[in-house]
Each structure stands twice: as structure tokens, then as C-alpha cells.
């Protein structure tokens, strides 16, 4: 399904929060949405590998990577594993790599930027916690909607009329 964050903002102005416009779109889907699963890690992707290997249908992995642009938290292997397990998308407050290859993976990805240097494989970080970045607080089980225009957040699932999709 395609989502139009501009129309969702107009219709649900009192319910949603808008994420600061600092993210770029990567991956094969230009829009995505789902229930938020949170992860906080800094330049370590071990827990990311574990999470994307789990069932992800209807979910979006939101990673607080501390805003690091020194090491990529998302690469082709992570994106493909997430897509294979049904994840709708990944929002990464950090960087990606393998940009050209990511475009061919059926998953939405938004991140701060790209760098060719990969992150450590260590399992350092925390899951299922409130995280703060880009002007919003994201809680596990919030709902997130993303497209080329931006990212919005809601405490509950938004009803999407066919005219908004």
C-alpha cells in the first residue's frame, strides 16, 4: 500500500507528530508504515541482525543510532533479511551502505545518509524502549508512516481512506 503523509497530516493534524525532515529514502519501497519496534545502538549492528531475523509483518524497525554517520548500521544483508521476514520498513537515525543494491530490495528504508564503512557486529544496545531523535519521542507500539515527503508518528493506527493511499 502507498501512503501519502501530506494528506495524513491534513486529516490527522491533532493526532500525529511530524519527524524533522532530516532523512533520505533508500530501499525499494518509496512509502511504508507499521507498528514501531525500537532499538537503540551506536555503531553496532548485532541486535539489528537479530531483530530483522524475526517475524516483521506490519512492523517498522526504528533504530536510534545516535545520529552517527561514521559507520553504516544498514547494509544489503540486513535489508534483505528484513524484507524476507516481512518487515515493512526501517527508519535509521544513522547511516546505510550498499545504496545501489538497497534500491532493489522490497523494503522501505529511511536514514540520515550513506557511508561505505560498516558497523561492528557486537550485540550492544537496547530494545523496546522510548527513543528520542528528530524532534519526536518514539515508543514501542506507536505507528509510523513514511514516504518521499516525510515521516509521521501516531499513538494509534490511522484509518487510511482510499483517497489518502
UniProtKB/Swiss-Prot annotation:
Record-level Gene Ontology MF annotations: endoribonuclease inhibitor activity; enzyme binding
GO CC annotations on file: cytoplasm
Matches recorded under InterPro entries: RraA, RraA/RraA-like, RraA/RraA-like_sf, RraA_gpbac
GO biological process annotation, one example: regulation of RNA metabolic process
Keyword ATP-binding in annotation: no
Pfam families (alphabetical): RraA-like (PF03737)
Function text: Globally modulates RNA abundance by binding to RNase E (Rne) and regulating its endonucleolytic activity. Can modulate Rne action in a substrate-dependent manner by altering the composition of the degradosome. Modulates RNA-binding and helicase activities of the degradosome.
Subunit structure: Homotrimer. Binds to both RNA-binding sites in the C-terminal region of Rne and to RhlB.
Protein's UniProt name: Regulator of ribonuclease activity A
The species this protein was found in: Colwellia psychrerythraea (strain 34H / ATCC BAA-681)
